[in-house]
Amino acid sequence: MFYNFLLYLVIHVNYALDALTFNKFLSLDGIVSWPMIIKDRVYFLSDHEGISNLYSVNLEGKDLTKHTNFTEYYCRNASSDGRRIVFQNSGDIYLYDPEKQELKLLDIDLPTDRKKKQGKFVEVLDYTTEAIANDKYLSLISRGKVFLMRHWDGPAVQLGEKQGVRYKQIQLLPNGDTVVLDTNDDKLTFLSKDGSIKKLNVDLGRIERIKVSPDGKKILISNNRLELWLYEVDTTNLRLIDKSEYDVISQMDWHPDNEWFAYTFPESYSTQSIKLAHISGKVIRITSPYGYDFSPSFDPDGRYLYFLSARHLDPTNDKVIFNMSFQRVIKPYLVVLSNTYSPFNQSLEETTSDKKVEIEGIEDRVIPFPVDEDYYIRIEGAKNNKVFLFSLPIKGYRYPGETLGKLEVFDLDSKTKELYADNVKSFSLTIDKGKILILFKDSIRLFDVNTKPDLNATGKKGGIVDLSRIKVYVDPEREWKQMFREAWKLMQQNYWKPDGLKDWESVLLKYEKLIDRISTRYELSDLIQEMQGETKTSHSYEMPYDYDTAEPLPIGGLGADYEYDKENKCYKIARIYVGDPTNENERSPLRDPGVQLNIGDCIKAVDGEEVKYNILSYLVNKDQVVLDVITKGKTKRVTVKLLKDEKFLIYRYWVEKNRQYVHEKSKGKLGYVHIPDMMYQGFAEFYRLFLSEFHREGLIVDVRFNRGGFISGLILEKLLLKRMGYVVRRNGKELPHPFFSSPGVIVAITNQYAGSDGDIFSYLFKKYKLGILIGRRTWGGVIGINVRDRLADNSAVSQPEFAVHFHDIGLKIENYGVDPDIEVDIKPEDYANGRDPQLDTAIELALKQLEEKS
């Protein structure tokens, strides 16, 4: 983002930081970084001319001088010893001598074994992304490599290219050969047991899903162009079946006759139907375009099409805010494909099983399952009238980690549903739908669909597939090259503007030639991120998974700040962070019952060891400690349970300090709300504070440091609900109407660290004329992402895909930000002295408006 970055200079020198005075002395339209003072000049890196180079100015911020003239790669990571400057440019390190005005490329030879580039074996389950089976074989993808083996014994064979490749979207053919997507060239690829590799050399864009017919002769292909194609293996005929205008056609299934197939079809931004098609080209919509239907799956006998639908709208009252929500809306349904009885309403006479698909009146043959709604995400029809239902628990953001689901089986004969397996990552059925393959966190298991699994049993009896047969070998150098190129290709294919990446091929050449110079996975991340930076677009991220580094040792937290007391040789408690003790991790352990330490108390020893060094070093990898504390001249011994993470406590302390300050300065007239992001935490924080603040005469909404997200519209919706009157009652104070409506005066504070949806909130706050916006210009990144693509080592990469365009200003927020109505900065000395000029200005403006209204 091209901020107007600033450098500050101390113009009044004093040894105490809180006595220093800083003035803005340089402003450039670009990124200014790594400031270094050498003699009477300030040196720094800046990209205000396009490519980052080394510059300097005098101590008055004048006489801007350029010292380097690199035109291809950025100068980065500058440092100085007070006389000279070193910095990085591409894979080289340069030394600049200001006195001699001399630039020198350093010849650095590091005699190391480059251990991180050496080959290694990895655990198969740690990187297993897909697994599938038929009646004989099981195939899976781990670390982007395809392995094939028999269910219970025999060797595991690696198919296709062994290194430098990334396969995905695996499908098994009846003979055990596989069909996959090769992400190196985005081609549909056939991998044979005999080692041969065949490709469908047609440009279909980024293939998102493939589904092979039961006989292995036809393949459905969906892509990022929102198209659905049908490929006939024997004739090599390729036909376009359908195309959406809204989203990827993501789910398909084949009828057992190999002629009919069903697929999801996005009808709008929020609705999706299911269509039924014949290989002849006939296509019909069989569910309403006004709901959200998904997960089509045929009964293996060809009688029914099962699917899930989020259409059961049964609202419940929210327990916190005056609102209603739909907690569980997804229900399983089936379509009777021929004009016969529903399985839930059998006739007295025996009916024959009819596999024929009858189109006429099919939309009237949609029947709900006799089960309650739940958070179902998948349905699969299996042999012997079994139907598998996979659901996830509903949980909030405070419960991180992988979400494991519940797998249930519904029996069409008995009309009952029972638990089949819990803590499931994913599952798939064999081609004949007679066996089920379940992926757990610690195993892959295969069962007959009629068998109740014994998850406590071991070996074959417990359905456990022996994965020790698979050896996943990784050649880092070849893998890094593949990952880099895939990250480049994903950007090429998913970037929001088709012609937006000019000369993208030259960008590949520019950075790919540096790959041989990297030695660690971290350096690969750095290289990918530099390549992504060439888009000059926000939200271009690489999120690494496998740095292969030692886990950092955790440091327990006391929820306090300290100062070393030289006289008593102990750490004096300078501040105890006070949060909300009713919230987890928001109470300082020093204030726990039985501990009750205070500011000024001095920690003399930890676990009997006298504190001689930084106190944090005594809290490493500990959950609980015994402290010897000098309090009121006496030594007290207390046992303290440490915090694993202090950030929630410190954040709550900061918010509550601001809120109390606003209340005191306004004499209770103004409320205060801080929104840390526009995601789950931000939504919770807004209502946590708004519920106790909305009844006041005015409100300050603070979105400084807002990390973005997607719920700004929900916050604005509440702020736009203006108070039109009151509900008067006999006892108690009157209630605002509408309830939870916003007060008449609102002032918002933003800054340069509010971005993405924080940018959007800041802009719409002004546009809706909700009040005055003060602070600093925002981050400037409003082209959104859908992080769905992962590289071979599970690292995630994003591509800017969704550009936010406003009627009046178009795309101008991107790479610029949102200007406040009134600019107010916070200088370093303000931070040092605990002052907040932005908050003070907001209070002043809100009180002035209240006075004018009265």
Swiss-Prot record:
Gene Ontology cellular-component terms listed: cytoplasm
Main location: cytoplasm
Site feature: Transition state stabilizer: 757
Subcellular location: Cytoplasm
Pfam family, one: PD40
Classification via CDD domains: cpPDZ_Tricorn-protease, Peptidase_S41_TRI
SUPFAM superfamilies: ClpP/crotonase, DPP6 N-terminal domain-like, PDZ domain-like
Coiled-coil regions, chain positions: none
Residues that, per the record, bind substrate: 709
Domain of life: Archaea
Residue positions of the active site: 539 (charge relay system), 756 (nucleophile), 814 (charge relay system)
Keyword set includes Protease: yes
PANTHER family: TRICORN PROTEASE HOMOLOG 2-RELATED
Record family assignment: Belongs to the peptidase S41B family.
Protein name per its UniProtKB record: Putative Tricorn-like protease C-terminal subunit
